[in-house]
Swiss-Prot record:
Organism of this sequence: Escherichia coli O6:K15:H31 (strain 536 / UPEC)
Entry keyword annotation includes Nucleotide-binding: no
Lineage of the species this protein comes from: Bacteria, Pseudomonadati, Pseudomonadota, Gammaproteobacteria, Enterobacterales
UniProt enzyme class: isomerase
Active site location: D118 (proton donor/acceptor), Y225 (proton donor/acceptor)
Catalysed reactions listed for this entry: L-ribulose 5-phosphate = D-xylulose 5-phosphate
Induction conditions: Induced by L-ascorbate. Repressed by UlaR.
A Gene Ontology term for the protein's cellular component: cytosol
SUPFAM superfamilies: AraD/HMP-PK domain-like
Protein name: L-ribulose-5-phosphate 4-epimerase UlaF
Family: Belongs to the aldolase class II family. AraD/FucA subfamily.
UniProt-listed Pfam families: Aldolase_II
Co-factor binding comment: Binds 1 zinc ion per subunit.
Encoding gene (name): ulaF
Length: 228
Protein backbone atom coordinates (compact mmCIF):
# COMPACT_ATOMS: atom_id res chain seq x y z
CA UNK A 1 0.00 0.00 0.00
CA UNK A 2 3.00 2.28 0.25
CA UNK A 3 2.79 3.32 -3.40
CA UNK A 4 -0.89 4.22 -3.07
CA UNK A 5 -0.22 6.09 0.18
CA UNK A 6 2.43 8.15 -1.61
CA UNK A 7 0.03 8.92 -4.46
CA UNK A 8 -2.72 9.98 -2.06
CA UNK A 9 -0.27 12.11 -0.08
CA UNK A 10 0.91 13.88 -3.23
CA UNK A 11 -2.68 14.42 -4.37
CA UNK A 12 -3.59 15.91 -1.00
CA UNK A 13 -0.60 18.22 -1.18
CA UNK A 14 -1.84 19.42 -4.57
CA UNK A 15 -4.93 20.92 -2.92
CA UNK A 16 -3.13 23.84 -1.23
CA UNK A 17 -0.80 24.12 -4.23
CA UNK A 18 -3.79 24.84 -6.50
CA UNK A 19 -5.51 27.05 -3.93
CA UNK A 20 -8.40 24.67 -3.31
CA UNK A 21 -8.13 24.50 0.48
CA UNK A 22 -7.65 26.79 3.45
CA UNK A 23 -6.19 25.27 6.63
CA UNK A 24 -7.34 21.60 6.57
CA UNK A 25 -10.57 22.10 4.61
CA UNK A 26 -10.21 19.20 2.19
CA UNK A 27 -9.29 15.58 1.62
CA UNK A 28 -8.33 13.16 -1.11
CA UNK A 29 -8.68 9.38 -1.17
CA UNK A 30 -7.91 6.53 -3.55
CA UNK A 31 -9.01 2.92 -3.65
CA UNK A 32 -7.21 -0.37 -4.22
CA UNK A 33 -10.12 -2.38 -5.60
CA UNK A 34 -8.28 -5.71 -5.61
CA UNK A 35 -7.61 -5.47 -1.89
CA UNK A 36 -10.80 -3.63 -1.03
CA UNK A 37 -8.87 -0.92 0.79
CA UNK A 38 -9.02 2.87 0.68
CA UNK A 39 -6.23 5.34 1.51
CA UNK A 40 -7.38 8.73 2.78
CA UNK A 41 -6.03 11.85 4.44
CA UNK A 42 -5.99 11.86 8.26
CA UNK A 43 -8.52 14.10 9.96
CA UNK A 44 -7.42 17.62 10.85
CA UNK A 45 -3.70 17.16 10.17
CA UNK A 46 -2.02 20.29 8.80
CA UNK A 47 -0.63 20.07 5.28
CA UNK A 48 2.61 21.72 6.42
CA UNK A 49 3.53 18.77 8.63
CA UNK A 50 1.80 15.91 6.84
CA UNK A 51 3.80 12.96 5.47
CA UNK A 52 2.98 10.01 3.23
CA UNK A 53 3.14 7.66 6.21
CA UNK A 54 0.39 9.70 7.88
CA UNK A 55 -2.16 8.54 5.31
CA UNK A 56 -4.76 6.20 6.80
CA UNK A 57 -5.81 2.89 5.27
CA UNK A 58 -9.38 1.73 5.87
CA UNK A 59 -11.44 -1.21 4.67
CA UNK A 60 -14.74 -0.78 2.85
CA UNK A 61 -16.58 -0.70 6.17
CA UNK A 62 -14.43 2.16 7.45
CA UNK A 63 -12.32 0.13 9.85
CA UNK A 64 -8.74 1.41 10.16
CA UNK A 65 -6.30 -1.28 9.06
CA UNK A 66 -3.17 0.87 8.92
CA UNK A 67 -2.23 4.27 10.32
CA UNK A 68 -1.74 6.13 13.57
CA UNK A 69 -4.38 8.81 12.98
CA UNK A 70 -8.13 8.86 12.62
CA UNK A 71 -9.20 9.01 8.97
CA UNK A 72 -10.92 12.04 7.48
CA UNK A 73 -14.33 12.81 8.93
CA UNK A 74 -15.66 12.51 5.35
CA UNK A 75 -14.49 8.89 4.99
CA UNK A 76 -18.02 7.46 5.02
CA UNK A 77 -18.97 9.68 2.08
CA UNK A 78 -15.97 8.48 0.06
CA UNK A 79 -16.70 4.83 0.87
CA UNK A 80 -20.35 5.11 -0.13
CA UNK A 81 -19.36 6.50 -3.53
CA UNK A 82 -16.72 3.80 -4.07
CA UNK A 83 -19.25 1.10 -3.24
CA UNK A 84 -21.81 2.46 -5.69
CA UNK A 85 -19.59 3.42 -8.63
CA UNK A 86 -16.90 0.88 -9.64
CA UNK A 87 -15.32 3.29 -12.15
CA UNK A 88 -14.16 5.66 -9.41
CA UNK A 89 -10.50 5.39 -8.41
CA UNK A 90 -10.06 8.64 -6.48
CA UNK A 91 -12.28 11.17 -4.72
CA UNK A 92 -11.70 14.77 -3.58
CA UNK A 93 -13.67 17.01 -1.26
CA UNK A 94 -12.84 20.69 -0.80
CA UNK A 95 -14.44 23.97 0.18
CA UNK A 96 -12.96 25.85 -2.78
CA UNK A 97 -14.46 29.32 -2.94
CA UNK A 98 -16.46 29.49 -6.16
CA UNK A 99 -17.71 25.89 -6.27
CA UNK A 100 -18.76 26.21 -2.63
CA UNK A 101 -20.59 29.45 -3.44
CA UNK A 102 -22.73 27.58 -5.98
CA UNK A 103 -23.37 24.88 -3.37
CA UNK A 104 -24.44 27.47 -0.82
CA UNK A 105 -26.70 29.10 -3.40
CA UNK A 106 -28.28 25.72 -4.07
CA UNK A 107 -27.58 25.89 -7.79
CA UNK A 108 -26.00 23.60 -10.34
CA UNK A 109 -22.90 25.01 -12.03
CA UNK A 110 -24.20 25.70 -15.54
CA UNK A 111 -22.43 24.50 -18.66
CA UNK A 112 -21.80 27.80 -20.42
CA UNK A 113 -18.73 27.21 -22.56
CA UNK A 114 -16.19 24.83 -24.00
CA UNK A 115 -13.87 24.83 -20.97
CA UNK A 116 -16.71 23.28 -19.00
CA UNK A 117 -17.63 20.89 -21.83
CA UNK A 118 -14.08 19.58 -22.11
CA UNK A 119 -14.52 17.94 -18.70
CA UNK A 120 -18.19 17.87 -17.69
CA UNK A 121 -21.00 16.61 -19.92
CA UNK A 122 -23.69 19.06 -18.91
CA UNK A 123 -24.29 21.04 -15.75
CA UNK A 124 -22.45 20.08 -12.58
CA UNK A 125 -25.46 19.15 -10.44
CA UNK A 126 -26.36 20.35 -6.97
CA UNK A 127 -27.91 17.89 -4.55
CA UNK A 128 -30.98 18.51 -2.47
CA UNK A 129 -30.51 19.53 1.12
CA UNK A 130 -30.24 16.87 3.76
CA UNK A 131 -33.10 16.61 6.23
CA UNK A 132 -32.57 17.19 9.94
CA UNK A 133 -32.89 13.45 10.48
CA UNK A 134 -30.22 12.76 7.87
CA UNK A 135 -27.87 15.29 9.44
CA UNK A 136 -28.45 14.12 13.00
CA UNK A 137 -28.09 10.49 11.95
CA UNK A 138 -25.20 9.15 9.87
CA UNK A 139 -24.38 12.53 8.36
CA UNK A 140 -21.35 11.64 6.24
CA UNK A 141 -22.93 8.42 5.00
CA UNK A 142 -26.10 10.29 4.11
CA UNK A 143 -24.03 12.87 2.24
CA UNK A 144 -22.81 10.03 0.05
CA UNK A 145 -26.34 8.77 -0.36
CA UNK A 146 -27.69 12.15 -1.48
CA UNK A 147 -24.88 12.39 -4.05
CA UNK A 148 -25.85 8.96 -5.37
CA UNK A 149 -29.52 9.95 -5.36
CA UNK A 150 -28.63 12.93 -7.56
CA UNK A 151 -26.33 11.07 -9.96
CA UNK A 152 -28.47 7.96 -10.27
CA UNK A 153 -27.22 5.42 -12.80
CA UNK A 154 -25.28 7.92 -14.90
CA UNK A 155 -21.60 7.22 -15.52
CA UNK A 156 -19.95 9.46 -12.91
CA UNK A 157 -16.80 9.99 -14.98
CA UNK A 158 -18.87 11.82 -17.60
CA UNK A 159 -19.64 14.51 -15.04
CA UNK A 160 -16.84 14.01 -12.52
CA UNK A 161 -18.12 16.28 -9.78
CA UNK A 162 -21.08 17.60 -7.84
CA UNK A 163 -21.89 20.31 -5.32
CA UNK A 164 -23.68 19.27 -2.14
CA UNK A 165 -26.29 21.84 -1.13
CA UNK A 166 -25.08 24.19 1.64
CA UNK A 167 -21.85 22.20 1.90
CA UNK A 168 -19.39 22.13 -0.98
CA UNK A 169 -17.92 20.28 -3.96
CA UNK A 170 -16.91 16.67 -4.39
CA UNK A 171 -14.95 15.55 -7.45
CA UNK A 172 -13.66 12.19 -8.61
CA UNK A 173 -11.63 10.49 -11.28
CA UNK A 174 -9.88 7.32 -12.34
CA UNK A 175 -7.25 7.86 -9.62
CA UNK A 176 -6.36 10.41 -6.95
CA UNK A 177 -4.46 12.75 -9.27
CA UNK A 178 -7.23 12.67 -11.87
CA UNK A 179 -9.75 13.51 -9.16
CA UNK A 180 -7.69 16.53 -8.07
CA UNK A 181 -7.40 17.62 -11.71
CA UNK A 182 -11.18 17.55 -12.00
CA UNK A 183 -11.56 19.45 -8.72
CA UNK A 184 -9.27 22.19 -10.05
CA UNK A 185 -11.29 22.42 -13.26
CA UNK A 186 -14.56 22.48 -11.32
CA UNK A 187 -13.38 25.47 -9.30
CA UNK A 188 -12.28 27.27 -12.46
CA UNK A 189 -15.53 26.69 -14.37
CA UNK A 190 -17.52 27.67 -11.27
CA UNK A 191 -15.64 30.97 -11.27
CA UNK A 192 -16.14 31.42 -15.02
CA UNK A 193 -19.87 30.73 -14.73
CA UNK A 194 -20.26 33.26 -11.91
CA UNK A 195 -18.41 35.94 -13.89
CA UNK A 196 -20.25 35.17 -17.14
CA UNK A 197 -23.68 35.29 -15.46
CA UNK A 198 -22.67 38.53 -13.73
CA UNK A 199 -21.87 40.07 -17.11
CA UNK A 200 -24.97 38.64 -18.79
CA UNK A 201 -27.68 37.38 -16.41
CA UNK A 202 -29.71 36.11 -19.39
CA UNK A 203 -26.85 33.95 -20.65
CA UNK A 204 -28.02 30.59 -21.98
CA UNK A 205 -26.28 27.24 -21.78
CA UNK A 206 -23.68 26.23 -24.32
CA UNK A 207 -25.16 24.94 -27.57
CA UNK A 208 -25.65 21.19 -27.27
CA UNK A 209 -23.81 20.45 -30.51
CA UNK A 210 -20.77 22.40 -29.31
CA UNK A 211 -20.85 20.71 -25.91
CA UNK A 212 -21.09 17.29 -27.54
CA UNK A 213 -18.17 18.06 -29.84
CA UNK A 214 -15.85 19.23 -27.08
CA UNK A 215 -16.68 16.42 -24.68
CA UNK A 216 -16.60 13.61 -27.25
CA UNK A 217 -13.36 14.70 -28.93
CA UNK A 218 -11.69 14.29 -25.55
CA UNK A 219 -13.63 11.42 -23.95
CA UNK A 220 -15.62 9.67 -26.67
CA UNK A 221 -14.86 6.35 -28.42
CA UNK A 222 -13.18 8.22 -31.28
CA UNK A 223 -11.44 10.83 -29.13
CA UNK A 224 -8.58 12.62 -30.82
CA UNK A 225 -7.52 15.22 -28.24
CA UNK A 226 -3.97 14.84 -26.92
CA UNK A 227 -1.40 12.15 -27.65
CA UNK A 228 -1.81 8.39 -27.65
Amino acid sequence: MQKLKQQVFEANMDLPHYGLVTFTWGNVSAIDRERGLVVIKPSGVAYETMKADDMVVVDMSGNVVEGEYRPSSDTATHLELYRRYPSLGGIVHTHSTHATAWAQAGLAIPALGTTHADYFFGDIPCTRGLSEEEVQGEYELNTGKVIIETLGDAEPLHTPGIVVYQHGPFAWGKDAHDAVHNAVVMEEVAKMAWIARSINPQLNHIDSFLMNKHFMRKHGPNAYYGQK
